[in-house]
Amino acid sequence: SKAAVVRLSLENDVKAAYYQAVYQAERLRVLESQDSLLAQYRTLAEKRYKAGETRQLELLSAERLQRENKMEVLAAHNELETAQLLLSRLVGSVETVEPKEDSLLPLDWKQASYNYSQTPDGQYSADRLKASEQAVRVAKNGFAPSLSLSLRNQLVISSWNPYDQDRSRFDGGNFMGFEVGVGIPLFYGATRAKVKAARKEREMIALEIKEQEQLRQQEYLSALSRMNAAYVRYTYYNEEGRERSDKMAEQGLLEYSQGEISYLEYMNVLQESIDLRLKRASALNDYNQCVLVMEKLCGRQ
């Protein structure tokens, strides 16, 4: 039914907004953890500068990185609030909706072949086609003869005549009878026009359904391709990039504090570390959003 199509679309919109809020919360956590590392970097740079071990340029670079990251944190806060406002509006709440997940995780998806007829869109289309076929049958009824049935009866109470009426015309006494009439249409022009219009409407609906089925099939294949690509990216950043990012941040701070690498090298390490973590979150969000699109196309809730 149309209600099922609308309900599925609304539920999918809510899910998409919810997991977008979860993603924005994950980005905020990454940036806030990076802010902690940059604060340590700035402290070390300041100590080394005061001790005369480095030039002021190193301290200025550390301060710049920390300020830039704080601006990114502020922007992430705003993006999270925007996502939460959208989610609150979709669920009809006046309060801010907080994601319950502490971290961004991949959604479950079981691969299945696409069958348009089993989706809410397909079922609604089938209902529309049945209704159009019924309209054709109703229009054809105008060619058939019409039957009418009426009941006639007479009841005379001989002992009661308060108005002293002449009852000679009722000498037949009491009786009950039926009358049956048959109406045969003599002109079929209007009926033919109705049948033609109903058939045309049925053909248009059938063509529209066929086009929609092809479009949904293309959307499914496109979404499947995007989902597989996003999963490959997520797998890399989750299995290799995440571990590498953590090791880079820890090892870089240790080597910099011991003077084994320059501040420029450490800046590159920090930048690559946060890029890997943010790319992991972005790839995972892309994958989850693709899963939600697949669920909507397949009619899953």
Range-by-range predicted roles:
Residues 1-7, 57, 61, 140-144, ...:
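Sec/SRP-type N-terminal targeting helices
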Residues 3, 7-120, 223, 230, ...:
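Periplasmic alpha-helical coiled-coil/stalk elements that build and connect Gram-negative outer-membrane
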Residues 21, 87, 125, 149, ...:
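Hydrophobic/aromatic residues within transmembrane alpha-helices of membrane transport systems
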Residues 68-93, 244-300:
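Short segments within alpha-helical structural elements
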